[in-house]
Swiss-Prot record:
Topology term for the membrane: Multi-pass membrane protein
Record family assignment: Belongs to the major facilitator superfamily. Sugar transporter (TC 2.A.1.1) family. Glucose transporter subfamily.
GO CC annotations, alphabetized: apical plasma membrane; basolateral plasma membrane; cortical actin cytoskeleton; photoreceptor inner segment; plasma membrane
Reactions catalysed according to its record: D-glucose(out) = D-glucose(in)
Main localization, broad class: membrane
Cytoplasmic membrane side: 1-10, 87-89, 144-154, 206-270, 328-333, 388-400, 450-490
Record-given protein name: Solute carrier family 2, facilitated glucose transporter member 1
Originating species: Gallus gallus (Chicken)
Amino acid sequence: MESGSKMTARLMLAVGGAVLGSLQFGYNTGVINRPQKVIEDFYNHTWLYRYEEPISPATLTTLWSLSVAIFSVGGMIGSFSVGLFVNRFGRRNSMLMSNILAFLAAVLMGFSKMALSFEMLILGRFIIGLYSGLTTGFVPMYVGEVSPTALRGALGTFHQLGIVLGILIAQVFGLDLIMGNDSLWPLLLGFIFVPALLQCIILPFAPESPRFLLINRNEENKAKSVLKKLRGTTDVSSDLQEMKEESRQMMREKKVTIMELFRSPMYRQPILIAIVLQLSQQLSGINAVFYYSTSIFEKSGVEQPVYATIGSGVVNTAFTVVSLFVVERAGRRTLHLIGLAGMAGCAILMTIALTLLDQMPWMSYLSIVAIFGFVAFFEIGPGPIPWFIVAELFSQGPRPAAFAVAGLSNWTSNFIVGMGFQYIAQLCGSYVFIIFTVLLVLFFIFTYFKVPETKGRTFDEIAYRFRQGGASQSDKTPDEFHSLGADSQV
């Protein structure tokens, strides 16, 4: 591997410390599902203690739905606030500061049972949602800016790997025999204190983003020193030259606001791509598959369906690792297309299997294969790629605003799916996956015609292509647009 493009200890420390925030996001996404019954019992017990009457089913459903959905509301607000922190405090320091929210949420949720307060639990879920929303901007941005061009895709996938590992840990810890029981569920929710503490210990030893130091702070000597440590070489002239060119371009541009992303022809195309890729992740049907998985495993005769669900979490993690190793060879666009096409095929298989399940019980095994296939294809493309490609599509100036918009798109679609899926599933039954198949095909078409290949390109080279296209970008043919990564394919 060429000098400056190798994995160094300092680079691994920086990425590893950052993705602890991604793990927190994944953990808090999955942790609330397993202990639902014991937490609802706690709500009922608290209500009975306060009002001397059992809680009504409608009120209990409302409180539980609020406990789940408030996490996404916090995420929406947090993701939209990314730009307020990263330019003022830096990328690394913003991640460190956000752990205040994680510690506060851990205390509120961990002591909610002792205080007989479901309000503390709900408030804690909102605060950890704020933290997670910030994390979905901070981590991919920081990792993208500290990584060498040749490793940017592979290291960018670590954000998604952290998320799926967090979900898997939550599934395992949520088992009744570990912490998903009546006595230990507060510890399950308060466990977020541990990764927050670890991140506070590790990140002070990680460097600030060299791009932030040079382009935002004009501290060239510090940026040069950081680059030497990150790259493991004394010759960082090419990195510095690329950053200086980006800095000169940024000085010629006025400050980029969120509205400017949509008004300017130069930014309109990349922000549209960023938004649609985020939607392709959340509207792909992955949450629907996890929702259906336990009932499908039960119908197929699996005695402990929860362990089969954990098995799908293992597949989730394993194929994220696969994506990590192939993303720099195959390219982002190619993997995203493969993932979308594979998911559409598996969604059709699931629809057929679920429709014929009552007449042909063996179809349950086909549905299990389809579930594992769906999850695997998700982690090959739509899972990891939308997160880090935002950093690649934008230069230093508009990047924070772009992450705010992309993050808000992701969290909003997550919230909509979370709130609306059960109603759609009741209405459509097993045919619900036809809706996701149509969406996946539409996302495939958009990706094929509009999304460029960014593999092997510097941030400035990618931004230059969009600047060159400007308002006429949409008039380019697919072949011209895809030339962005053509020479890296040969």
